Amino acid sequence: KFDLFYLYWKGNLIFYGNESELSETQNSQPAIMATSTAIFRALVSENLLPEGSFQAVAGHSLGEYSALVANGGIGFNDSVRLLKIRSKAMQDSMPVGTGGMIALIGCEKDIIDNAIKSASQDGKIYLANDNADGQIVLSGEINAIDFILQNAKSLNIRRAIKLPVSAPFHCELMRHAAQVLQVEINKINFNKFDADLYSNVTSMKCTENEIAQLLIDQVVSIV
């Protein structure tokens, strides 16, 4: 059964919580999904996005859950339940402060590869997000992240931004979280999609039968 108290608490956190609380992944994940879904439903209710008028949906990382709610593939309640489990498992995979993420702006592939190679001497680090040409995000252990931040100039990185997150998402350090999520996600019956869904993992259209495994893979895969 859906926990209404949980939603009420998250709603208060969204509007009145401080940055530190909202940066913790067990808070930010359900909060972002709830906010995204509220915006989507407002657009539909105001007929700015008529129901059934869109042919495809996609969501980046956590946004894939909002996209699934939007296309009818999963109910809002089930999405919140999965994100409660997903976010806790992600945080439990590494203690707060031991891992993180860093965005690199305006870098060519050889510069990124060299940064990863250099930083890996201080800890595990992985390519996590390929957002656009010249904008990627790395995930890893905090010593490796800090190495890049402190040595950005000598590594020829135009701009490095440490992200305000509490864990290193979308990399092998989240393997435990993927295993925990797999147990719970296999209990979900996904509905027939109202619109095509494009997967973060494959960048291709996926089906109701494929989405469960793709959501599990997404936890440890580049998106």
Stretch-by-stretch model annotation:
Residues 1-58, 138:
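Helix-rich "cap/lid" substructures immediately adjacent to catalytic or cofactor-binding pockets
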Residues 3-8, 17, 28, 71-222:
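Alpha/beta catalytic cores of group-transfer enzymes, especially the acyltransferase/condensing modules
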Residues 32-35, 62, 75, 82:
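Generic hydrophobic secondary-structure packing signal
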Residues 39, 64-65, 89, 109:
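A short acidic, glycine/proline-enriched capping/turn motif at secondary-structure boundaries
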Residues 57-60, 128:
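Structural motif
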Residues 60-68, 73:
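Glycine-rich nucleophile elbow surrounding the catalytic serine of serine-hydrolase chemistry
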